[in-house]
Amino acid sequence: GYLGGYAAPAIAAAPAIAALPAASSIAANGY
């Protein structure tokens, strides 16, 4: 994990745009 505050908006937006941004956010943040 990198920053919860940074991941939260990405995770919140992920379902609207699909799994692509979710996977990118997870990879970028180390989750």
Curated annotation (Swiss-Prot):
Record keywords, A-Z: Cuticle, Repeat
Sequence repeats by residue range: 7-10, 13-17
An example Gene Ontology molecular-function term: structural constituent of cuticle
Residue ranges crossing the lipid bilayer per the database entry: none
Repeat among keywords: yes
General function of this protein: Component of the cuticle of migratory locust which contains more than 100 different structural proteins.
This protein's domain notes: The tetrapeptide (A-A-P-[AV]) repeats found throughout the protein are also present in many proteins constituting the protective envelope of other species.
UniProt protein name: Cuticle protein 54
Native organism taxonomy: Eukaryota, Metazoa, Ecdysozoa, Arthropoda, Hexapoda
